[in-house]
């Protein structure tokens, strides 16, 4: 829909364009001229403002009054001099009036409307006054007018008195004062020469109509009532001797006669008695267009050159127009584009790494418009670029939407529902008769070096800690042991999570798959920060806790202190009246290990319903995964429900394939794995992530499609996470100052959990904003030649965690100069990379005062300016050093330099304390006796 213009709105309201422009200026809207277009909301405000100001319709009031015909039976006021005749009171019955002879009785008439006619023709005041005086003189010499009596139905004259057609021929009548000759009035706007040209042949006339269209409901024009006027040269006037004046219809105003250059006679009201002949064309050479008199009622407009003409019709707005206006009102403009807005409570759910196109589909908007809006908000992005949650929050707040980013769990659940897989619904549909008891899954948690792995080693009667570098568990291990309970053996599955803070995410996943948590606390150290962190993870997962107080055989151990400290965190021992079992153990001597297993089984039987359905496809979690040189991708999985068999098609995260072989923690082959059983699976296409869910599908194709969709989702999430938000100001500054420095890393590790934990730890390193840490690639396995090629292109450093490069990769790295660093303990990797980032920072400088000199005398020289005679109070004054002048503690001159330094007549490089000298500060001459000259130097500030 086209936008309205100012002059159109002014014409619709009935005011001139200047008034509308002035009102717009008051409203604060910048509009150039009457032809400028404005927005529909601004148009509505303009109309409301004009209506409130009381100026609406003032310009259109005279025209409306003239166009409205008098109602039947309405009383009219006394005729005014110079006005048109108005109908008098309408009696119910009136006798017929005989037509008087023209020679005896003059025809009753009212004064001419000379003033109105001259005003409409825009004549000068002088000509109007002269004609008005002549009209009054003629009216005074005429016979007093008799009241005209009208009947409801005026009789038609006899057939012999048919009037001549109103074709513009002058008619004789009562003598009237001689009007000025047309064409001789230099002040008149109409210079017609009396005789009208043929209608339609005047190329300069504003009215090109070939005749006036009869009024609606009338068969012809009404006969004009006789009016006084001077005889015009030409044919005799009809209605003369022997012809009576045809009275007007009931309640109708008699139509006026046409006149040169003036307004033509008024058209009869619809429904008036019709008369024979043709309607008179518009009078005058350049008369006002339209033959409908002053008022342009229905049918009053002049016909156009090729058919129906007339004035501008005012039709009602269609539903489509109103709907378009409503949509424009509901979609305001932002940044020059129209976008739909929310009410502030509209929730829009987006997946991780969503793009502007995804957001546009949710709110039914154009992606290009949203890109423009985001650009005006200071963010630059393309329509298909993955954005982070913070950027969507900014955009949603501006548009009135609440952005809700779907969690990874919900996103994966929705993805599986697309393949008709609903894991939660499967568990709800299972009956109690198909559920069987499964072993409990226990997670060992605690602080670093509190003996978690040593305790698990004592339980398994095997030494697994010797294979860990530095005695620190680097990846998750899952084992199943058998313990005697009430006369028979029962299985317990243990998951050993690393205690270092870098593996927080891995420990969190361990708490999500566990049934019972064993919190290991050293009796000599007591509660430590990671002990509280592990406790919070277990409580957040709503997991029962069994506390193992380790190292009770060590000197200085105080198990009672541990019980007292844990009481502050809501863990109250049974001996203190609580419900948490505390067991004193010694992993070194094996004391209390059997009591600990007994406590685990009692806790499982008391408060947990450990049952699952083994007779269905397997579902579970990948505990850890690694890339074996001879066996390929190997994943340690924990079956939560169902049975996993060799040959099943499985998908775990972004990896898929068929189970080629399964082995337990001892390396023995397993053909079937039941619930709560940890096994190593071979046959996956890639290495899944630690904590990824796995499931068995009916076909390989389904597993591959699920893996590909998960990979795309994860890729978008990584792109959104790695995206650097940059504003317009930062972008301009970056263009001026150059590229921001960054340290690119490639991380390769032996297991996926360690790689992920190392990546998260590196991203937490806090350095200055001028240096960025970018991890461009991560993977599991040895460093390959492709990794070296990628590092060559991006100037990256390769970090190897418990892996080594192959010979080709080592040779290419030496040839290309790629830095490859290998670590077996995570502490060393974090420290060295943090040092590298700190070394890339730009040096920081600070001001150091080097000397202060007091001005004792000022020597003025026409060649060198003012020279300060000083004495050095402290430090050393050095030539070319930066200086500032201080007067009464206020700096009066800054960014100066010691351009000349002399002792007596010799130039010197420095002057020490308590020596006098002469100092020249170049063009700076605002120095006085008593001022101080302070010299400073910039020294590099060491980083902490």
From Swiss-Prot:
Q: Name one GO cellular component term.
A: cytosol
Q: Where is the composition biased (Basic and acidic residues)?
A: 123-135
Subcellular location, in the record's words?
Cytoplasm
Locate the region G4: 550-553
Write the record's keywords in alphabetical order, separated by commas: Cytoplasm, GTP-binding, Initiation factor, Nucleotide-binding, Protein biosynthesis
TM stretches of this protein: none
Q: Which residues form the signal peptide?
A: none
Query: What does the entry list as the binding residues for GTP?
Result: 446-453, 496-500, 550-553
Span list, region G3: 496-499
**Keyword match Nucleotide-binding:** yes
Name the InterPro entries on file: EF-G-like_DII, IF2_II, IF2_N, P-loop_NTPase, Small_GTP-bd, T_Tr_GTP-bd_dom, TF_IF2_bacterial-like, TIF_IF2
| Annotated stretches, region: G1 | 446-453
Show the SUPFAM superfamilies listed in the entry. Answer: Initiation factor IF2/eIF5b, domain 3, P-loop containing nucleoside triphosphate hydrolases, Translation proteins
Q: Where is this region: G5?
A: 586-588
The task this protein performs is described as: One of the essential components for the initiation of protein synthesis. Protects formylmethionyl-tRNA from spontaneous hydrolysis and promotes its binding to the 30S ribosomal subunits. Also involved in the hydrolysis of GTP during the formation of the 70S ribosomal complex.
Q: What is this protein called?
A: Translation initiation factor IF-2
Query: What organism does the record attribute this protein to?
Result: Clavibacter sepedonicus (Clavibacter michiganensis subsp. sepedonicus)
Q: Supply the gene name.
A: infB
